[in-house]
Amino acid sequence: MATLADIAKLAGVSISTVSRVLNKDETLSVTEDTRHRILTIADEIGYTKYKTINNSKKEKYQVAIIQWVSEEHELDDIYYYNIRLGIEKRAYELDYEMLHFFNDIPSSLGEEVVGVLCIGKFSREQIAKLERLKKTLVFVDSDTLNQGHPCVTTDFENSVQSALCYLKEQGCNNIGLLIGQEKTTDATEIISDPRLRSYRNYCMEKGIYDPLFILTGDFTVQSGYELLDSKIKSGATLPDAYFAASDSLAIGALRALQENGIKVPDDIQIISFNDTTLAKQVYPPLSSVTVYTEEMGRTAMDILNKQLLAPRKIPTLTKLGTKLTLRNSTK
């Protein structure tokens, strides 16, 4: 079991300093970096006695989750559901109560709410509205460094590069992209997708970029089906492979290919993104980029908890790695 002495040794400070930091002694004069180092080490070695900001009080503090999509949409998109699940599991471990808001930003929150976790993409106007809540904010699945808030995202750029590299190594000289176009829920901003940028950069670097191989719709099975079915029926040349920016798009595309007598992976290969449970349930099972959505939520909750314990003025961007999981939609 981890002890104060263990933390003190690793942090290079006295046991007394560790104890006073963990007990939030406001009379203690230490640098922000030292305070943060002690709290981080305590987390890493499993010291849990200090875990929440209210451990000396009987009442529980609350954390609000603001989900950018509706509850109905979340049921259809396990990606955002899993992020929320990760937040809730970690919040329970840290002894916080949860409030939920779906596709809605409240005008105010009670004093018992100490922080807000914002899942999804938000416009500048929406972020300004969130800031007016006067709570500690952490964003998940969007880069809000420029707005001055800590955030957790997936390493989209390297994920796409790794998928495209694999297809190129399999002899695919022409690689298409299936992608969705999103707007913020207030419809004021079109969301720039880093996967599109990464795809373009890679293909241009390799001299294989062809804008005709990019098919844009929305992130649904139906859109994936319609995009590829229309492409096939037009008689246009198909690429050797497609990278689909979601499992849903890939599943729709797979059905269109099968209905038109095009074999996967013999005639065309597919790699999808997210690796939800659906990816392994279709035939053939999809090769997919595994995204650790639940861990994104847990990480965001940890960041919020640390901000409440020892606020840092400099915002941080935490990118989680991914893994290319190969199945039968590639050779």
Swiss-Prot record:
GO terms for molecular function: DNA-binding transcription factor activity; transcription cis-regulatory region binding. Residues 4-23 bind DNA. Pathway: Carbohydrate metabolism; galactose metabolism [regulation]. InterPro entries: HTH_LacI, LacI/GalR-like_sensor, Lambda_DNA-bd_dom_sf, Peripla_BP_I. GO terms for biological process: galactose metabolic process. It holds the Pfam family Peripla_BP_3. Residues 1-62 form the HTH lacI-type domain. Keywords: Carbohydrate metabolism, DNA-binding, Galactose metabolism, Repressor, Transcription, Transcription regulation. SMART domains: HTH_LACI (SM00354). SUPFAM superfamilies: lambda repressor-like DNA-binding domains, Periplasmic binding protein-like I. It comes from the Bacteria. CDD domains: HTH_LacI, PBP1_GalR. Repressor of the galactose operon. Binds galactose as an inducer. This is HTH-type transcriptional regulator GalR.
